[in-house]
Amino acid sequence: MAIERTLSIIKPDAVAKNVIGQIYARFEGAGLKVIAAKMVHLSRGEAEQFYGVHKERPFFKDLVDFMVSGPVMIQALEGENAILKNRELMGATDPKKAEKGTIRADFADSIDANAVHGSDAAETAAVEVAFFFPGMNVYSR
């Protein structure tokens, strides 16, 4: 099994619900290590740049508006098959379709306010981790 890194963002809705610790416990329970973390309030420019891949999609403006609506908790996770494990923990994008016991089923309200973001592939994970944690801010342990 490969040790991977992935990016996770706990979105403004979940931060406002004060469930960061509960979500971290799920990461750790699945064998994922938090190797970098910070709480930030994204600027519109940061959110637009980070989600730039979706720029032409009809939901782009609403996504950016939501991501700048309050603080987010950003973390790099590391572990065996970290990308897939994190995506399984998150559940389906639409919390109404997410399996019971997933982060989105338990903490998200809608497809827009869906509690968490997670990298979808190794290539995007590398880009996303570097976006928020450039250089020496990531510590394997």
Swiss-Prot record:
Pfam family, one: NDK
Cofactor annotation: Mg(2+)
Top-level division of the source organism's lineage: Bacteria
Record keyword Secreted present: no
Catalytic site positions: H117 (pros-phosphohistidine intermediate)
GO biological processes: CTP biosynthetic process; GTP biosynthetic process; UTP biosynthetic process
Enzyme's top EC category: transferase
Enzyme Commission number, as recorded: 2.7.4.6
GO function term, MF aspect, one: metal ion binding
Keywords on record: ATP-binding, Cytoplasm, Kinase, Magnesium, Metal-binding, Nucleotide metabolism, Nucleotide-binding, Phosphoprotein, Transferase
GO cellular component, one term: cytoplasm
UniProt-annotated binding residues for ATP: K11, F59, R87, T93, R104, N114
Entry-linked SUPFAM superfamilies: Nucleoside diphosphate kinase, NDK
Protein localization: Cytoplasm
Substrates-to-products reaction catalysed: a 2'-deoxyribonucleoside 5'-diphosphate + ATP = a 2'-deoxyribonucleoside 5'-triphosphate + ADP; a ribonucleoside 5'-diphosphate + ATP = a ribonucleoside 5'-triphosphate + ADP
InterPro entries membership: NDK-like_dom, NDK-like_dom_sf, Nucleoside_diP_kinase
UniProt keyword Cytoplasm present: yes
NCBIfam families linked to this entry: PRK00668.1
Entry function: Major role in the synthesis of nucleoside triphosphates other than ATP. The ATP gamma phosphate is transferred to the NDP beta phosphate via a ping-pong mechanism, using a phosphorylated active-site intermediate.
Subunit structure: Homotetramer.
Similarity remark: Belongs to the NDK family.
Protein name per the record: Nucleoside diphosphate kinase
